Amino acid sequence: MSFVHDLQKWKEVEKAFAKYLIDYPDIISIEFPKGKCKDYDVKMTYGNDKTATYEIKTDFKAQDTGNFVIEYRFKWEASWIYASKADYIVQYILGKWWIQKRWELILRIAQVEKRETKWWDWFQSSLYIIKADKLPELFEPLNFNETPNESED
């Protein structure tokens, strides 16, 4: 299963992200395309308001479609999630997973945070889905796994 089939799919991704940039201000920026990068950087700080803020900058390389970069910042209340669990989640997001899994996890974080769902409950329940490689069930809004329509009404 390929992540982004062609440039038309990239256009859909970029258009969809424009909405996320408005709806989810914690997403800092996304750029198309980007230079050849393969690393990520994570910065974690604790605030006086009993929150832990994680900043992730991740450069992904996609076959045949160029590169893109996502910068994402998210914050948890300390009472929601212990630092050890947060660290594990960050490692999971940036671990040795396929590009689409990492991409979808980053987007899903924003969606879950926006809905004020219990983040850790979602993550735990999603581990099985991800390991089972059932990405369409995991990720619904952008429908990456569907072929773009030739025409739109």
Regions found by a protein language model. Give the residues of each.
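Short glycine/proline-enriched coil/turn segments at helix->beta-strand junctions
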Residues: 23-26, 48-51, 93-95
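Beta-rich nucleic-acid/ligand-interaction surfaces
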Residues: 35-43
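Non-catalytic C-terminal interaction segments of nucleic acid-processing enzymes
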Residues: 66, 94-153
